[in-house]
Amino acid sequence: MTLRLKGNQAERYAEAFLAGHRLVLVQRNYRCRFGEIDLIMRDGETLVFVEVRMRTNRNFGDAGSSITLSKQRKVVRAARHYLLSLRTEPCCRFDAVLLSGNEGRDIEWIRNAFDVNYS
């Protein structure tokens, strides 16, 4: 399986997991010149920008360690770009869904994984 297919599969797992926790999909793979957001979900009135990471082995660290400060900045910039297209600015947060283990079936959801102030 190619890296892109694995990434798409991880995003589908994450989306299904979050939907099971009553989050509603707004958009997948939002892309702009500043970066990409894997999933944009709605949790009640809060808009949630989700970074999805998958690691099947820990030779290069766990899935969470790959969300570097540089990556956080790109996600925040892309989120700001997305928000410009809305009529109102909702409450927002940045979550991470980390998949690990065999086939990435072990899921960890980190709410407020990073903050705009640190990016």
UniProtKB/Swiss-Prot annotation:
Q: Kindly give the SUPFAM superfamilies that the UniProt entry links to this protein.
A: Restriction endonuclease-like
Sorted alphabetically, which InterPro entries does this protein's record hold? Restrct_endonuc-II-like, tRNA_endonuc-like_dom_sf, UPF0102_YraN-like
Q: Name one molecular function that GO assigns to this entry.
A: nucleic acid binding
In this record, what's one Pfam family?
Answer: UPF0102
Domain of life from the UniProt record: Bacteria
Q: Which CDD domains match?
A: PoNe_Nuclease
TM helices/strands, residue ranges: none
Per the record, the similarity remark reads: Belongs to the UPF0102 family.
Q: What is this protein called?
A: UPF0102 protein Nmul_A0195
The species is: Nitrosospira multiformis (strain ATCC 25196 / NCIMB 11849 / C 71)
